[in-house]
């Protein structure tokens, strides 16, 4: 999303995913009244775009998995939808897309999985990820990293990923 975008770099060896690094790029709406809404949006998009591109340059991934946005119910939601779609379109290598429902079903097993269930699943599967813990459980704010980890698993069961595996053997 425009507010929080999590990126996870992982390695796949013999069918086992290992999380190597993770970041969350955060942007916040300007509180200054004299800043135009469009200028604020452009600035936030710039922060997001630069952060994503720097992360891709740092790790040089062979494959990128992304969660495509789902329907929005408001003008603000639709704006975020557009920003997300544009960001996905600019990625190189071209991203393998999954939906929020595919992500939840591929990991927790139900399309109605809660944020807490998604975090618990990701934490159990990848304790090596850079979690910030409170009482031995990741903070709720880390739902974005948990989702990014889950997106990897959903992406790995797509026909697009199967095709890539078949041509790179």
Enumerate the predicted regions with their spans.
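Phosphate- and other anionic-substrate recognition elements at nucleic-acid/protein interfaces
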Residues: 1-169
């Amino acid at each position: 999303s425009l507010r929080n975008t999590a990126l996870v770099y992982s390695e796949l060896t013999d069918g086992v995913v290992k999380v190597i690094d993770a970041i969350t790029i955060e942007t916040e709406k300007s509180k200054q009244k004299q800043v135009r809404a469009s200028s604020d949006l452009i600035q936030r998009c710039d922060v997001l775009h630069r952060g994503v591109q720097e992360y891709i340059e740092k790790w040089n991934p062979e494959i990128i998995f992304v969660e495509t946005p789902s329907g929005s119910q408001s003008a603000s939601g639709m704006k975020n939808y557009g920003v997300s779609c544009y960001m996905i379109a600019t990625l190189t290598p071209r991203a393998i897309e999954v939906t929020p429902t595919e992500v939840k079903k591929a990991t927790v097993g139900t399309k109605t999985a809660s944020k807490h269930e998604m975090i618990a699943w990701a934490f159990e599967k990848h304790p090596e990820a850079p979690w910030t813990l409170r009482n031995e459980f990741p903070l709720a704010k880390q739902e974005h990293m948990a989702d990014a980890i889950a997106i990897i698993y959903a992406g790995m069961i797509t026909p697009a990923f199967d095709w890539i595996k078949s041509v790179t053997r």
